[in-house]
C-alpha cells in the first residue's frame, strides 16, 4: 500500500505522512499463512467391515489443513488476534475433513490476548478434544490413534461415544495465563439457537506441564432439542490423562467416561508410549471401550496400533502404522498404511 501511494504522490508531503502512519500500523501487526499436508496409502478395514480395499487416504497421522492467523499489538501487553483454519482431503482435493463440514471447520475465531489470559469468540476447539490429542502417542490421527477413533468416530458398535466435532460453533472460550505449568480453559456455546438456554454446550479443561510430567482433566456437557446419533438429548463426558517422559521413552495414560440421558454409557481407557529409535520414534497405543446400552448386552471394542515415524527434515516426516481391532460379535479389523506429512 505504501509503495503505491509513494509512486503516485511522491511529491506530496501529505501522502508521505500517510505512508509513515500506515508503516507504523504494519509494524505492529502480522499475518501468517501455514498448514499441513498428510497423505497415506494402505488398507483400512474397520471391525465388522467386509473385504479389503487398497486406498490413498488423507490425514494418516494428522488431518490435512491450511490456515491463516494474525495479531495486532494494541499496547499495554494486549493483542487483538484472529485465526481461520480449513480442513481439506488431499487425496481428492475436497474441502473439509468430511462431507458437509463448514469451510473453516478446524477453527475460526477472533479475540483478545494479554497478561490476564485469552478470550476468543467463534468456532473454537473442543477442550475435550484438546485433552484427548495431547495425551496419546498418535495425537489427533483419525486413522491410527485408538483414543481418537474410539471417542469421535462411529463404528459397528454404533454412534461415536462423544457427539461433538473437534470444534464447537458459536462459542466463547477463556484461557487463563500459565502459572506454574498450569493453564485452565472454559467454553460456552448456546448452540446458535437464541432463547434456548437448555441447549447450551459447556466445556472446560486444565493442562499441567512441568518437566517430564504432564497431566490433564476435561469435562464436556452437550444438550440438544432433537436427538444425537446415539438417541440421547443430553451427554456429559469426563476425561483424565497423564504422561511421563523417562529418558527416551514417553508413557501415556487416559481414561474417559461418557454418560447420556438415555442410559447409554461408554468407558474408554488408553495406554501408550513413544520411544526414540534412531532418528525416528516407535509409537504404540492400545485403547479399550466398554459400551453399556440401556437394553441388550454390553459391547467391548479393543484397538492396538504399532507405528514408526521418521523425520526427513524439520517440516517433513514419513510414517508407517499397523492397526488391529476386535469387537464383540463382529469380525475383527486389520489396517496398515504408510504415508508422508509436510508442514508449511
Task: Kindly label every feature range from the protein language model.
Residues 23-27:
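Sec/Tat signal peptide C-region and signal peptidase I cleavage site
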Residues 28-43, 54-190, 198-200, 207-211:
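Outer membrane beta-barrel
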Residues 38-40, 85-87, 124-126, 187-191, ...:
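Outer-membrane beta-barrel pore domains and translocons
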Residues 41-49, 88-94, 127-131, 192-196, ...:
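Gram-negative outer-membrane beta-barrel proteins
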Residues 67-69, 109-111, 173-175, 205-207, ...:
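Outer-membrane beta-barrel architecture
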Residues 78-80, 116-119, 181-184, 212-217, ...:
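Repeated loop/turn-to-beta-strand initiation elements of outer-membrane beta-barrel proteins
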Residues 201-305:
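Detector for outer-membrane/organellar transmembrane beta-barrel domains
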Residues 332-344:
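Outer-membrane beta-barrel "beta-signal"
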Amino acid at each position: 500500500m505504501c509503495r503505491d501511494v509513494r509512486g503516485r504522490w511522491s511529491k506530496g508531503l501529505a501522502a508521505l505522512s500517510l505512508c509513515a502512519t500506515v508503516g507504523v500500523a504494519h509494524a505492529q501487526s502480522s499475518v501468517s499463512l501455514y498448514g499441513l499436508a498428510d497423505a497415506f496409502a494402505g488398507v483400512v478395514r474397520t471391525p465388522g467391515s467386509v473385504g479389503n480395499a487398497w486406498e490413498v487416504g488423507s490425514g494418516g497421522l494428522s488431518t490435512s489443513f491450511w490456515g491463516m492467523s494474525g495479531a495486532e499489538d494494541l499496547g499495554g501487553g494486549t493483542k487483538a488476534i484472529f485465526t481461520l483454519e480449513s480442513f481439506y482431503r488431499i487425496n481428492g482435493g475436497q474441502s473439509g475433513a468430511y462431507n458437509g463440514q463448514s469451510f473453516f471447520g478446524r477453527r475460526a475465531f477472533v479475540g483478545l490476548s494479554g497478561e490476564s489470559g485469552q478470550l476468543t469468540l467463534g468456532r473454537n476447539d473442543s477442550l475435550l478434544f484438546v485433552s484427548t490429542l495431547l495425551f496419546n502417542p498418535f495425537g489427533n490421527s483419525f486413522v491410527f490413534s485408538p483414543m481418537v477413533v474410539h471417542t469421535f468416530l462411529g463404528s459397528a458398535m454404533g454412534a461415536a461415544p462423544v457427539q461433538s466435532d473437534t470444534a464447537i460453533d458459536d462459542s466463547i472460550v477463556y484461557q487463563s495465563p500459565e502459572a506454574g505449568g498450569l493453564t485452565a480453559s472454559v467454553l460456552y456455546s448456546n448452540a446458535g439457537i437464541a432463547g434456548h438456554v437448555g441447549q447450551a454446550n459447556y466445556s472446560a479443561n486444565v493442562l499441567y506441564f512441568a518437566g517430564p510430567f504432564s497431566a490433564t482433566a476435561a469435562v464436556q456437557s452437550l444438550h440438544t432439542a432433537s436427538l444425537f446419533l446415539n438417541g440421547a438429548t443430553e451427554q456429559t463426558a469426563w476425561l483424565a490423562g497423564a504422561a511421563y517422559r523417562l529418558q527416551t521413552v514417553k508413557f501415556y495414560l487416559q481414561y474417559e467416561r461418557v454418560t447420556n440421558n438415555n442410559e447409554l454409557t461408554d468407558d474408554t481407557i488408553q495406554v501408550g508410549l513413544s520411544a526414540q529409535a534412531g532418528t525416528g520414534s516407535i509409537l504404540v497405543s492400545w485403547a479399550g471401550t466398554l459400551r453399556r446400552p440401556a437394553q441388550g448386552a454390553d459391547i467391548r471394542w479393543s484397538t492396538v496400533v504399532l507405528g514408526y515415524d521418521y523425520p526427513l527434515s524439520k517440516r517433513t516426516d514419513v510414517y508407517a502404522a499397523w492397526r488391529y481391532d476386535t469387537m464383540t460379535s463382529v469380525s475383527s479389523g486389520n489396517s496398515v498404511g504408510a504415508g508422508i506429512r509436510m508442514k508449511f
